[in-house]
């Protein structure tokens, strides 16, 4: 077989060589020893999920911790799965979580010297490599129709053998030049298949940076490299792009493990160095006591939009995911409470290979700790930015009352033990909306030992003695006086010792006042809140209940 002639028959329009792309267009990167090149390569299907972000943080840390390069590549070769606007969604979502790419696709165009970074724009490159494989005798045209392939599959099932296109079932594997020419003259569509030399009885070994040494069955399938429209399959594009973009580490989910033999054979056939493969564990959750994989259908928290709509701070999500990614992160954080997360020495050796457990409750706890360290001014700006996107009806209120909102967010946060009760924007607004008359409502009930008439007596006394200029001590002393004058213990411990002597204690009186002013039985420091509200609003809140 004259493979050179076959290649020219199939690819008359391809005039460049693989070495042209390797040496001229995409030469080896000039990086320091040990620098890693990673890529995130999502498909524009309209859904970007937590698993993408999980893997992206691994990519980002490997690259930036080694002074390497982090690439965003869009794998858009499957027209059937493309969703309008999905690329913009992917990029904006990743930007929201502060993932910084060094090169690749962007909303305003591409950055970098190893593009195009959209696979749909790299057709000539893939066809050049495919032509090279044909010249090597390791790829060939297949003219089988869908019906013929289905018939082959039915026969394989009937004979109880492996399904697929291989060995004796690869009916176009050894077509002559004359036969190929005849098919072409008949304008029959064709795909380009890889000619595998694998034996299904054989295995090979390969190292995975997370899972260690793996023993796997070799690939024996003659997989499709180029579809009939000249666009590559995922398997082929992945190998070509990772080689020419000089990717050193491929981070992907464990669901791709089964494809590793294909990629291994393609890399070795082309004489290219394999990247280091890092197959991450599935994100799992406990559901009714059973551990299962997070599901797009069952679990809204799998989609990144879930966190963006609620307004989780990207720093909180990243902090939490790092606790899942590396088993020693929490210990490091305890020892380095104020250090930047990028100072943490991330390691592939500390990653789980048996299913990473995702827990929303723990994310919320982590978020409380992270937000407690972020200045109120920054939280306000984040809240406003979130509102402009997801809760436009409160934007004007936040802007008109900027100083007051910042002060509200500051209450109880500037002490040795700052309050930790802010989680995400939706919850933060719920937490402070009592300040706005438009949203104020009485949510909680008075203590069981205080009826409506009793509450009015307390509130009336409070209104009569309230002086906005009182300091915190003077203010609370007046509340204690109101308590004792109305039969309540001035100290909870006094009530605890002699419950029959009192109606309740000063805490009950404070709760009545708190509910009147903020609508809830618990809140941050009430004296500070009143100082922010101003005397007029405080008196109005009390008066409306009398």
Curated annotation (Swiss-Prot):
Keywords, comma-separated and alphabetical: Aminoacyl-tRNA synthetase, ATP-binding, Cytoplasm, Ligase, Nucleotide-binding, Protein biosynthesis
An example Gene Ontology biological process: glutamyl-tRNA aminoacylation
'HIGH' region (motif): residue ranges: 42-52
Positions with a binding annotation for ATP: 296
GO molecular function annotation: ATP binding; glutamate-tRNA ligase activity; tRNA binding
Superkingdom: Bacteria
EC number: 6.1.1.17
Single GO cellular component term: cytosol
Reaction catalysis annotation: tRNA(Glu) + L-glutamate + ATP = L-glutamyl-tRNA(Glu) + AMP + diphosphate
Motif 'KMSKS' region location, chain numbering: 293-297
Subcellular location: Cytoplasm
Reported function: Catalyzes the attachment of glutamate to tRNA(Glu) in a two-step reaction: glutamate is first activated by ATP to form Glu-AMP and then transferred to the acceptor end of tRNA(Glu).
Matching PANTHER family: GLUTAMATE--TRNA LIGASE, GLUTAMATE--TRNA LIGASE, MITOCHONDRIAL-RELATED
Assigned protein family: Belongs to the class-I aminoacyl-tRNA synthetase family. Glutamate--tRNA ligase type 1 subfamily.
Binding partners and assembly: Monomer.
Protein name, as recorded: Glutamate--tRNA ligase
Organism: Acetivibrio thermocellus (strain ATCC 27405 / DSM 1237 / JCM 9322 / NBRC 103400 / NCIMB 10682 / NRRL B-4536 / VPI 7372) (Clostridium thermocellum)
Lineage: Bacteria, Bacillati, Bacillota, Clostridia, Eubacteriales
